[in-house]
Amino acid sequence: MNTLQTKNVALVAGASGIVGRQLVNTLLQNDWEVIGLSRNPSPHLQNLPVVTVDLRDAGQAARALQPLTHVTHIFYSAWLNAANWAEMVEPNVTMLRNLVSSIDTVASLKTVSLMQGYKVYGAHLGPFKTPARESDPGVAGAEFNAAQLTWLSDYQLGRLWRWNAVRPGVVGSNVPGNTMNLALSIALYASLCQSLNLPLRFPGSPQTWGSIVDFTDAGLLADATLWAATSPAASNQAFNVNNGDVWRWAELWPLIARWFEIECAPPVRVSFERMFKDYRSVWRELALSKRLAESDILKLNDGQFADFVFRWDYDMFGDGSKLRRAGFRGMQATDEMFFRLFRQFRAARIIP
């Protein structure tokens, strides 16, 4: 345990995800030493020191993490899926516990940052109080984000390091190959509609069309996460992190259609997952004719998270003012975020 260490050393769990990859880039740009953590080798982490470990196994975690005596900050954005919300609790709390307790034993920790989301407010269950605030009471029912924070805050008592939790809205990212990338799902859908001479029909219900939603740019989220990890004002606090604006799909969707130069059409329920499977051969032909980087649309995005989002027929937004009052000043116009991501997808030959 090096108590004289001055350089910040980040251990990032979930480094290959849409949140983790941007966070790694931001940390490196700010002269941090970064170590990735992964259950399986990832091609996205080739230029990063990586510890491969299954955090569900306490013994394996302790052995694999024992050499990391120089780690100062843990950034935790990993998660394990399961058949239902209740079954997600035990493995996800176990993974966090095995990581934090192992590093706490060997290193002089400063901060543990936990990535959460609006599920702590019951957003996944149905209509909930909006804007959601960090001071809102908990929600009955098993949910791993809340269970993780309960464990972390209890474990930290009496220790010198501090924790923080960040709670983004729907994250906007340029990372392909991840189901959680809504912007890419929309871009693929729009590209298919364009190639089939179809209008860009809103894929949700009329209620979803009129609902309010907020978003979080991955770069802004990384900046806020770094700020929270290094600011005394964030000690043992949770923060909603959003772009600072809210939108109705009825306002945003026509702007997206205009960007793709497609006619906008009224809501009809469309499953992105079903469409991407049904039009897999259409995408393959489009990719070949336009010389796109990936000819298999399902390797880019499976549409499942998009279907989840477009089933929200209720408002989904949080109050981001606590973060700004504490000292973080970042903002992002959501429409411009989407347009920038679409340009990046096009530049990378992901969409035509």
Regions found by a protein language model. Give the residues of each.
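Active-site Tyr-X1-5-Lys
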Residues: 138-169, 174
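Mid/C-terminal beta-alpha module of Rossmann-like enzyme folds, strongest
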Residues: 222-307, 319-321, 325, 342-349
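N-terminal Rossmann NAD(P)H-binding glycine-rich loop of SDR-like oxidoreductase domains
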Residues: 2-30
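NAD(P)H-binding glycine-rich loop region in Rossmannoid oxidoreductase-like domains
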Residues: 42-98
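A conserved pocket-lining segment of Rossmann-fold NAD(P)-dependent short-chain dehydrogenase/reductase
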Residues: 188-216
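Glycine/proline-rich active-site loop of Rossmann-fold NAD(P)-dependent oxidoreductases
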Residues: 159, 171-189, 219, 227-239, ...
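Glycine-rich Rossmann NAD(P)(H)-binding loop
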Residues: 13, 173, 204-211, 239-246, ...
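Conserved Rossmann-fold NAD(P)-dependent oxidoreductase catalytic core, especially the SDR/UDP-sugar
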Residues: 74-76, 94-144, 164
